[in-house]
């Protein structure tokens, strides 16, 4: 759950949906559905209506300790939970289960993606920061590996082309930002 890596609750839905769209194996969706719903409901309990984000104090790249500079909402973790909600809704549609919750989870995913785009892009620093507006990370223009990589990939639909280009230039201007392992 939330105590075994901050993204643990989000990953089953994402993995199950990726498996389904790759293989067409719907049986796995039915087998995993009870756990997927349990984790979605746990995430619902941690959802901050005002921020439109999941309270997540640890980032995906390092979930052994809390990162207070992110203000309680780490970017990569937020993206992962938004994807989880999106995929939970898709799984429910395909399986015909929990039909009454589909719109709720679709809306939650959309709210989170909108909030991420609005709260994490720092125009002055030309980057997506690891924490939202008001956090130390936002004020100082700090980013974290996983969140940075996720916003840059067009697959996730976070950064606009302009933001992507600016952020890549910002990363390139920091010689210590790149390693042989990634950002």
Regions found by a protein language model. Name each.
Residues 1-53, 74-82:
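Aromatic-rich carbohydrate-recognition surfaces in CAZymes
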Residues 49, 60, 123:
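Residue-level signal for pocket-adjacent positions within structured domains
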């Amino acid at each position: 759950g939330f105590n075994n890596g901050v993204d643990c609750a989000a990953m089953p839905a994402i993995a199950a949906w990726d498996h389904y769209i790759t293989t067409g194996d719907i049986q796995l969706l039915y087998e995993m559905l009870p756990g997927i719903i349990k984790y979605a409901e746990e995430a619902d309990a941690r959802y901050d209506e005002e921020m439109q984000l999941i309270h997540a104090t640890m980032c995906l790249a390092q979930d052994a300790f809390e990162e207070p500079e992110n203000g309680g909402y780490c970017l990569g973790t937020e993206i992962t939970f938004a994807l989880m909600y999106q995929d939970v809704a898709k799984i429910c549609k395909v399986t015909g289960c929990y039909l009454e919750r589909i719109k709720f989870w679709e809306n939650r995913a959309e709210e989170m993606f909108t909030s991420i785009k609005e709260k994490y892009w720092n125009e002055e620093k030309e980057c997506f920061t690891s924490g939202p507006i008001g956090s130390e990370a936002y004020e100082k223009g700090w980013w974290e590996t996983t969140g940075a990589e996720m916003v840059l990939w067009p697959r996730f639909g976070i950064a606009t082309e302009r933001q992507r280009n600016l952020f890549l230039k910002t990363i390139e201007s920091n010689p210590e930002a790149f390693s042989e392992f990634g950002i």
